[in-house]
Amino acid sequence: MDNNEKEKSKSELLVVTGLSGAGKSLVIQCLEDMGYFCVDNLPPVLLPKFVELMEQGNPSLRKVAIAIDLRGKELFNSLVAVVDKVKSEIDVIIDVMFLEASTEKLISRYKETRRAHPLMEQGKRSLINAINDEREHLSQIRSIANFVIDTTKLSPKELKERIRRYYEDEEFETFTINVTSFGFKHGIQMDADLVFDVRFLPNPYYVVDLRPLTGLDKDVYNYVMKWKETEIFFEKLTDLLDFMIPGYKKEGKSQLVIAIGCTGGQHRSVALAERLGNYLNEVFEYNVYVHHRDAHIESGEKK
């Protein structure tokens, strides 16, 4: 195993810290969506024990992000020493990300959320004094950070995009597309981002031999696909999705749910969901899953 392969096999730990109100919670949420195992507000003294667990090779702990802030002020003072100890003694890749913002911006954010700064709770002081005290206390950990991000002029979306550029693992694609078929008469797919109604297509229900089957059966699938209307629809649908899906991912979504509905969710929607799932698997390097919610609900009513 060469040096590059050894580095790739190591577990990775990202310590996220910085000024209160600078965006740590948003960063942790983003990292979690990217496949990181996330821990919020771990006391620094427990960091070496936690890293020892990572060294044991648990797959779920291959990429870990830990948020540490100044709420435990006395414990926080040991963070720099603990990080140095971990780097020198334990075979884990460790980075420190420090988030900060201007005092004016932090004051504005606290006014918007109406939350108290953690250092205001430890004594009767103004918000601006609490922010200045925190900035001073965190200066040492800031000095050893691998990444310092000033979020003053970053929107939540822009901050997420920056985090993804820094830390997204190209070998671990977390964006997932779920394609599901459903029947309108059983209720719409509530978690869908996109819903397409295919009740305008010729219905296999009216072919006696096809009625008890589903779109998973070859005869039903071929029946649905043989119509010119189906081909035109599928071409327009895939053209639309080819345009939209990269935009959804760029926007920061970790999952896209595409629902295709017919009357009962047994024939047309099932066949088209299968075809769409196969198409998306071929075109995109994302995780694509196909699910048929109502395909096997037995009913004597029109499907």
From Swiss-Prot:
A GO molecular-function descriptor: ATP binding
SUPFAM superfamilies linked: P-loop containing nucleoside triphosphate hydrolases
Domain of life: Bacteria
One Pfam family of this chain: RapZ-like_N
Positions annotated to bind GTP: 69-72
UniProt keyword annotations, A-Z: ATP-binding, GTP-binding, Nucleotide-binding
Binding site for ATP: 18-25
Reported function: Displays ATPase and GTPase activities.
Family membership noted in the UniProt record: Belongs to the RapZ-like family.
The protein's name in its UniProt record: Nucleotide-binding protein SAB0719
UniProt source species: Staphylococcus aureus (strain bovine RF122 / ET3-1)
